[in-house]
UniProtKB/Swiss-Prot annotation:
InterPro entries: 4Fe4S-binding_SPASM_dom, Aldolase_TIM, Elp3/MiaA/NifB-like_rSAM, MoaA_NifB_PqqE_Fe-S-bd_CS, PQQ_synth_PqqE_bac, PqqE-like, Radical_SAM_PqqE_MftC-like, rSAM
Protein source organism: Klebsiella pneumoniae
Purpose of the protein: Catalyzes the cross-linking of a glutamate residue and a tyrosine residue in the PqqA protein as part of the biosynthesis of pyrroloquinoline quinone (PQQ).
Binding residue positions for [4Fe-4S] cluster: C22, C26, C29
UniProt-recorded name of the protein: PqqA peptide cyclase
Radical SAM core domain mapped to chain residues: 8-223
GO terms, biological process: pyrroloquinoline quinone biosynthetic process
Subunit field text: Interacts with PqqD. The interaction is necessary for activity of PqqE.
Residues in coiled coil: none
Domain of life: Bacteria
GO molecular function, one term: S-adenosyl-L-methionine binding
Keywords for this protein: 4Fe-4S, Iron, Iron-sulfur, Metal-binding, Oxidoreductase, PQQ biosynthesis, S-adenosyl-L-methionine
Catalysed reactions, as listed in the record: [PQQ precursor protein] + S-adenosyl-L-methionine = E-Y cross-linked-[PQQ precursor protein] + 5'-deoxyadenosine + L-methionine + H(+)
């Protein structure tokens, strides 16, 4: 029996992917492989109109992301406009291109929160992963400058098989920098990370050791009165049930790409679903009425075993993008789930990780030339 149309609440979190331009070449970047096709970017006025519409709908948090959002010269103006509208604003940055004068301008414009990402705890590995020899010292300097301006000190480390074994040193660096919050996020396999999965996915043993390191540090830090919050995000490739991706399709999160495509999650543009542009439809119409945003809302779309599963209200059938990447159909159950007929895809990935000997230098790095080669090859 068909269920009633699901209740749709406003999007609480808006992510503005301002640009795909970036000075780094991280091989786990979540940007689309064909980002080099996407040269157009919304203008300052167009972005502010997106913010205005989202705020009118009830959005409360706005993240500035990319690529590297610092490449936008109008970033202070965008921050000020968002602040004037009443958003809580968050800058998600590599720190490359950040200066003390820019920090002062952002503070004056009303920026609430800055998150700086690192690739590793040491300069050599950081340079190898970022493709930039000067990145590490710049990140250190800007992390200290952020702290000096009384922003919440939030550091992000993407963990994978090449840096997860230095987790103790990573945490020590965060303590040294007096971080308030540390996101230790094991690589999520979308975009460039999926392309490099065999060379990035940690082994089960590495994950287990990392969990123990985090647990030990939490205990040690609590005993010493250190209030730094360590958030450790494990890869769902070693779980038996999928994550409730984005809190459910089209439930709380709305992303807008550099050229204006509206998406229910960062990776959804790869799906064989037409997603509308903010240049052609209002944000309200896109959120409530568009086919793309309604495609996987509720439960009626679900095949078995999801449809009759007593956990469907918790995980929503898992990740649609992951189902598409691993099975060829976004309608299928997320293969992470042990009930999925495609769970063997996850088991194969685990076996690959256990045997992989791919070095950092052998990864496919995210850059414009590589992106052009990838989509030219796929167009043949």
């Amino acid at each position: 029996m068909s269920q009633s149309k699901p209740t749709v609440n406003p999007p609480l979190w808006l992510l503005a992917e301002l640009t795909y331009r970036c000075p780094l070449q991280c091989p786990y970047c979540s940007n689309p492989l064909d980002f080099a096709r996407q040269d157009k970017e919304l203008t300052t006025e167009q972005w502010i109109e997106v913010f205005r519409q989202a705020r009118a709908m009830g959005s409360v948090q706005l993240g500035f992301s990319g690529g590297e959002p610092l490449t936008r010269k109008d970033l202070p103006e965008l921050i000020r406009a968002a602040r004037d509208l009443g958003f809580y604003t968050n800058l998600i940055t590599s720190g490359i291109g950040l200066t003390e004068s820019k920090l002062d301008a952002f503070s004056e414009a009303g920026l609430d929160h800055i998150q700086i990402s690192f690739q590793a705890s040491d300069e050599v590995l950081n340079a190898a992963l970022a493709g930039n020899k000067k990145a590490f010292q710049q990140k250190l300097a800007m992390a200290k400058a952020v702290k000096a301006r009384d922003y919440p000190m939030v550091l992000n480390f993407v963990l994978h098989r090449h840096n997860i074994d230095q987790l103790d040193k990573i945490i020590e660096l965060c303590i040294e920098l007096e971080a308030d919050d540390v996101e230790l996020a094991t690589c999520q396999f979308y975009g460039w990370a999926f392309l490099n999965r065999e060379g990035l996915l940690p082994t089960r043993e590495q994950i287990a050791r990392a969990e123990q390191v985090v647990a030990d540090y939490r205990q040690k830090m609590a005993a010493s009165g250190n209030l730094t919050n360590l958030l450790f995000v494990t890869p769902d490739y070693y779980e038996e049930r999928p994550k409730g991706c984005m809190g459910g399709w089209g439930s709380i999160f709305l992303s807008v790409t550099p050229e204006g495509t509206a998406l229910p999650c960062h990776s959804a543009r790869q799906l064989p679903v037409a997603f509308p542009s903010v240049l052609e439809q209002s944000l309200e119409s896109i959120w409530y009425d568009s086919f793309g945003f309604n495609r996987y809302r509720g439960y009626d779309w679900m095949p078995e075993p999801c449809r009759s599963c007593d956990e469907k209200e918790k995980d929503f059938g898992g990740c649609r993008c992951q189902a598409f990447m691993l099975t060829g159909s976004a309608d299928n159950a997320d293969p992470v789930c042990s009930k999925s007929p495609h769970h063997h895809k996850i088991l194969e990935a685990r076996r690959e990780a256990a045997c992989s000997d791919i070095k950092v230098s052998q990864l496919q790095f995210r850059n414009r030339t590589r992106s052009q080669l990838i989509y030219q090859t796929r167009d043949l």
